[in-house]
Each structure stands twice: as C-alpha cells, then as structure tokens.
A protein has these predicted regions:
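Small-molecule-sensing regulatory modules
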Residues: 1-25, 102, 107-241
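Short glycine-rich anion-binding loops that position phosphate/pyrophosphate groups of nucleotides
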Residues: 52-55, 141-143
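A conserved helix-loop-strand patch within extracytoplasmic ligand-binding domains
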Residues: 52-53, 61-112
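Short, Asp-centered acidic motifs that coordinate Mg2+ and/or phosphate
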Residues: 45-49, 134-135
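Short beta-strand and adjacent tight-turn residues that come in two discontinuous sequence segments
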Residues: 32, 50, 137-139
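Short, structured active-site "lid" loops
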Residues: 20-47
C-alpha cells in the first residue's frame, strides 16, 4: 500500500504563458520543463511530471526520469472543419507549431501554405472553427485525453507522419539521490514504454539536435526487436533522410 499524502502543485511555465510566439523564439520546447526542474532541484517539489516530447534528450544533472507511464497513442491527426483529408486541400492554410510538422505537411501536399499556430489544443481547434485556418496537425494523445476526438478528420500512420520523439509518453522525474521516491516511481514504470522512450531519446542525443531541428522518431517493440522509424530534414527543408 501507499500511505503518504500527495499534494499536487500546478506550475505555469514560460512555455504556457508566452503563446503568441513560436516555441523556437522563446527558448524551445525545453522551456516547458526547465522551471519545473528548478523547483525539483530546490526541493520545492519531490516529483515532476512532464510530457516526454518536451524534455531535452540529455538528463538534467542531479535529476532522473524514473518512471515512464504506459504510452498513449503516438500518432498525429488532421483536424479540419471543411476537409476530410489533408490531400483534399488544393489551396489552403494549415496551422503548425513545429518545423518538423511544417515540412512533413509539405511532403504530403505541396500546395498547402503552412503558418505558425500556438495556444493549447482547445484554442487551436477554436481557430479552425472560426475559419482562421483550414486545418491543423495535432497529437492524437492530447485529443484523446481531452475528449476531443470528434474533431479528428484523419489519423496518420506512424510511417506516413512520423511524430516527435517521446510523443504520447508521460515521464515522471525525481532527484537522483532521492531513494525513497525512486522506489515509489519504479512501481508505476511501464517497461515496454521505457524501452521505446530510451531508443527514441538515444537517437535524438546522437543527432545532437535542438528545438529547431526538424526530426521525427518513433520506436515500436516487435517481439525482441525495436522497430525505429526516423525522419530528418536539412535546415533549409530541401533534403529529407
């Protein structure tokens, strides 16, 4: 059993607050994590819960991810009011919050104009409903969690639209020297998710990319093997590997 009281502390990060600028302009995805990690280091909190996709591939000194919760769906979706498929758009405007998604959209449909879109999932869907954009690419995991699946028009396979590393995974972090908390977190760790997460993060770490690097990566366990799909774009977006 578990006999400790858990107090949940909600922390608004700079990534949540500055939603009128591109992620890369305000310090990258890591901005969603750094301020929470600082509170963990200062012992203001004992456990930090992150979306793994927002975390740096390098572990923060003194901290450790000690639990990966079972992965939600890692796939990407197309949300639109007027179109059923992204290929149906002849001339239109799609909202994207990342360079990776922007370049992947162009591979699927070169006629589409891609413009930056920020805000939480509700805000982005509202912009679609108002006609500000013809569609937007959103993570299926977020839409499922928020019960917004009814807005989905198309779900892409992991091969046709490779997601960002760690998509759909919740990572639970604690201090490296906090043995009591580590024992607790070990009990909720999902080993298959951990294996895939480590494979994806190792790939990112090897590349040495940052928030401006357009790269997708998805690992799936198949028996004793890991099937890792990856996609990397050159800085100018003209080459894809």
């Amino acid at each position: 059993g578990f006999d400790k009281e858990i107090i949940i502390k909600t922390i608004k990060t700079s990534g949540d607050l500055f939603q009128n600028k591109k992620i890369s302009e305000i310090g990258g995805k890591d901005l969603f994590c750094k301020e929470i990690e600082e509170k963990l280091i200062k012992k203001e909190i004992d456990i930090a819960v992150h979306s793994l996709k927002d975390m740096d591939s390098e572990e923060t000194k003194g901290l450790t991810i000690h639990a990966y919760l079972e992965r939600n769906d890692a796939r990407e979706t197309f949300v639109s009011k007027s179109f059923n498929k992204i290929s149906d758009i002849k001339e239109g405007k799609i909202g994207s919050s990342s360079k990776r998604r922007e370049l992947q959209i162009k591979l699927l449909n070169k006629d589409i104009k891609v413009e930056s879109i920020r805000g939480n999932v509700d805000t982005r869907i509202e912009k679609i409903e108002k006609g500000e954009y013809d569609g937007v690419i959103l993570a299926l995991a977020g839409l499922k969690t928020l019960n917004l699946k009814n807005h989905i028009k198309q779900i892409f396979s992991l091969k046709e639209f490779i997601p960002t590393a760690g998509q759909g995974i919740i990572a639970v972090q604690c201090r490296e020297n906090d043995e009591d908390t580590k024992k607790i977190l070990k009990k909720i760790n999902h080993i298959n998710t951990e294996i895939c997460a480590l494979a994806e993060r190792s790939f990112l770490k090897t590349l040495g990319g940052d928030c401006d690097t357009a790269v997708g990566c998805s690992a799936v366990l198949k028996g004793n093997n890991i099937d890792l799909e990856a996609q990397l774009f050159s800085d100018d977006g003209k080459e894809v590997y």
